[in-house]
A protein has these predicted regions:
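Residues in and immediately flanking transmembrane alpha helices
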Residues: 15-16, 86, 128, 335
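Outer-membrane beta-barrel pore domains
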Residues: 49-53, 72, 91, 100-104, ...
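Cleavable N-terminal export/targeting peptides
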Residues: 1-23
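Outer membrane beta-barrel
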Residues: 23-187, 195-201, 206-215, 278-284, ...
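An N-terminal domain-start capping segment
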Residues: 22-24, 237-238
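Intrinsically disordered, low-complexity regions enriched for glutamine and histidine
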Residues: 15-19, 78, 179, 258, ...
Length: 353
């Protein structure tokens, strides 16, 4: 009996060992090994002397974490979370900002589906750090879905939909002369299903005649649905276009964009037209290290000068490493609607991980 028990225990031990060895040899797919985890943080100080609304505060402008993967050689996927919520709006809710996959087999035709940046303006899809200033320009913020004039929830310029894009007419060096983007979206912003069952159509086309230079135009037509207490739905139209130009080469950046919008806000209190224009320059003092910058940033909430708000900005940034930089800006702000002029100072420490 003892011999039988000893043999049984030995057989069991060998079986467990064999299973452990088998588990040890289970291969993890290469695309899982290649998943890239990253993130960034933007710590901010702002002070202003605006009458009746003075400000002297530290803020977490953005904290985000993301994962990128290639589950297939021709397929790219990304998920990104915003961890800090919107402290400027008194919200601390964590939210999903990106979740999409893109088939990238051909440069002339790539197909993206999920939640991602709307293909409207040059500035909207830019990374908040490389965009270069204390915030996105007013016209992009109000007319591309950050704090949209239609009343849409803050969506960081994103929506849920399907997009085609590609590069055309490559030259001998492989540099494309033409780029297009066109997409169909819900029109509601992030993390929300369509409400009025209508879709937004957004597209852009730009030419790149010289290295670093691109000149483009964008169009957007659609609506935002709002469900009422009685169950009915109100559709707020959005008809917008933009003209854009940018030169970015040798650490210099020159960029300007004009956006025009036709369509009321949901309460019909702001008129049915708005527009805005910005022009900026970022110039290197020490290449890839120290830059000075200036921006003219105008937005007219009702396309009338009496509703204009203008930022005249100057600043500088110092890049300690590719993952750490310090930004300082001063702005003189003119608000015609309130007949006020005031000063604004912004300091940011930006880092990537």
């Amino acid at each position: 009996m003892r011999k039988f028990l000893a043999l049984s225990l030995a057989a069991l031990a060998l079986g467990v060992q064999a299973q452990d060895q088998k588990k040890a040899f289970i291969e993890v797919p290469q695309w899982v090994k290649d998943i890239k985890l990253s993130g960034y943080g933007m710590v901010q100080y702002q002070g202003s002397d605006k009458e009746g609304a003075k400000e002297n505060t530290f803020n977490l402008r953005l904290v985000r974490a993301s994962a990128e993967a290639r589950p297939h050689k021709d397929f790219y996927a990304k998920v990104q979370m915003q961890i800090n919520g919107n402290t400027s709006e008194g919200s601390s809710a964590i939210r999903l900002v990106d979740l999409f996959g893109e088939w990238q087999k051909y440069k002339f035709l790539m197909v993206k589906a999920g939640q991602f940046k709307r293909p409207f303006t040059f500035e909207n899809p830019m990374h908040p750090i490389t965009q270069g200033f204390m915030s996105y320009s007013q016209n992009v913020s109000k007319l591309a879905g950050f704090s949209d004039r239609t009343g849409e929830q803050a969506s960081n310029g994103r929506d849920i939909g399907l997009q085609l894009q590609g590069d055309l007419l490559p030259d001998a060096s492989g540099r494309a002369w033409l780029h297009y983007q066109v997409g169909v979206f819900n029109g509601q912003g992030i993390n929300v299903k369509d409400v009025d069952n209508r879709k937004d159509l957004i597209g852009g086309l730009w030419v790149m005649p010289l290295e670093g230079l691109r000149i483009g135009a964008f169009g957007w037509t659609g609506s935002r649905g709002t469900k009422q207490a009685d169950g009915s739905v109100i559709s707020t139209p959005k008809n917008r276009y933009a003209f854009s130009a940018e030169y970015a080469k040798d650490d210099w950046t020159l960029r300007s964009e004009y956006i025009h919008s036709q369509g009321y806000d949901v309460a019909h209190t702001k008129g049915d037209k708005a527009d805005g224009l910005y022009a900026l320059c970022i110039a290197p003092i020490i290449k890839k290290k120290l830059h000075v910058k200036a921006r003219y940033d105008l937005y007219r909430d009702q396309k009338e000068w009496g509703t204009s708000k203008t930022f005249y900005e100057v600043g500088a940034d110092y890049v300690f490493t590719k993952n750490l930089q310090l930004n300082i800006e001063y702005a003189r702000v003119n608000e015609r609607a309130t007949k006020s002029n005031y000063n604004l100072v912004d300091v940011e420490l930006d880092f990537r991980f």
